[in-house]
Regions:
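Conserved PLP-anchoring active-site segment centered on the Schiff-base-forming lysine
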Residues: 43-92
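Conserved PLP-binding catalytic core of the aspartate aminotransferase-like
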Residues: 254-301
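PLP-dependent enzyme catalytic core of the Aspartate aminotransferase-like
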Residues: 286, 298-338
Length: 338
């Protein structure tokens, strides 16, 4: 067996099928991706309610915003990132829409002062929080917290429905390619492949298709069937427990601060400098621990500063307590020697 931590999910199958996330969510619509979900939600609002302007937080996955550019709606950024306590400066008028983000499952903008704007909350990093806030709508990607190749969702209001979205051939083919990548990664971790080159090639080719509007589709039916086998609540609960365990193992240091204490997404470190972040990241990769940076390619200076200091370390349900302790110990050992 090859021991690697982080990066993309390998294929996982479960017969438990006990998720309340799907069974107890009225008006939940499944899409190929999170960006397809928000695209179709905005499209619905434009045609049905006359939405004119939408605001996205400046610190965000900008590929999602670009996917929505062709819609007949003005798109703006409002200043906000999860380490800045920015007040929301927004034109609170009828016909305006504000997208808020539950960042890493730990922080989101306070929109209590907004009385007229429609609020849409992105719960990608905290799937089980859907419906818990006063937002008008919820959407997200499923593939950040769950081992599934494609998937997004949108929760509408009662009696609202999408009428013109279907499954596309490109969405189906991309799902199949992503599945091949996940199967190949499983083989790689079992030491049945000489290298990770093949599965990485399939992953990268599939990921490129997410930017293509030909994947503006409902969730492929095969993906829905796979999703229904996953014990979603169990996965996220285990991830929370692992992250809490990892945090308890970390020794205090002035080199970084932990941004999250209770979430089901990942361990989020905010490093003192970009140099510390980059050096720690390289050290972890050298030890087969592959952290993520959320999100690259920021536009505004404050957001670039955060992008350059943040590190997201996976301690999810894939890993045992012993493996989580190993990851935390590696972080500790790095700072012992600097």
């Amino acid at each position: 067996m090859i021991k690697e931590f982080g990066s993309d999910f390998h294929y996982m199958y479960s017969e438990k099928g006990q998720s309340k996330f799907l069974d107890h969510q009225d008006d939940l619509n499944l899409f190929f991706s999170g960006r397809a979900a928000i695209y179709n939600l905005l499209k619905l609002g434009i045609s049905k309610y006359g939405w004119k302007k939408v605001g996205f937080p400046s610190y965000y996955c900008h590929e999602v915003v670009e996917f929505c550019r062709e819609l007949d709606i003005e798109i703006e950024y409002y200043p906000y990132n999860p380490v800045e306590d920015n007040l929301i400066d927004w034109d609170d008028k009828e016909g305006t829409v504000l997208v808020t983000v539950n960042f890493f499952g730990i922080k989101k903008a306070n929109t209590d002062s907004l009385k007229n704007a429609v609020i849409i909350e992105d719960v990608t990093h905290d799937l089980l929080s859907i419906g818990e806030s006063s937002a008008d709508y919820f959407f997200g990607s499923l593939r950040k917290q769950l081992p599934i190749g494609v998937g997004g969702f949108c929760k509408l209001k009662k009696n609202e429905t999408f009428v013109d979205v279907c499954e596309t051939l490109e969405a189906h083919e991309t799902y199949q390619k992503k599945n091949v990548a996940m199967f190949l990664k499983s083989d790689y971790l079992k030491d049945n492949l000489e290298s990770n080159i093949l599965y990485r090639q399939y992953y990268e080719e599939a990921e490129e298709m997410f930017e293509n509007h030909l994947t503006n589709s409902v969730m492929p039916q095969q993906a829905v069937s796979q999703l229904q086998t996953l014990p979603i609540e169990d996965f996220i609960t285990t991830t929370k427990e692992n992250i809490s365990l990892g945090i308890r193992q970390l020794r205090p240091t002035n080199a970084y601060r932990i941004l999250n204490n209770d979430n089901g997404f990942c361990l989020v470190l905010y490093c003192e400098t970009n140099e510390i972040r980059n050096s720690l990241r390289k050290y972890l990769i050298d030890h087969k621990i592959f952290p993520a940076i959320l999100w690259p390619h920021q536009i505004f200076e404050k957001d670039k500063d955060l992008q350059n200091k943040i590190l997201c370390i996976h301690m999810d349900f894939r890993y045992s307590h012993e493996e989580v302790i190993y990851i935390a110990d590696r972080i500790n050992k790095y700072f012992e020697n600097v």
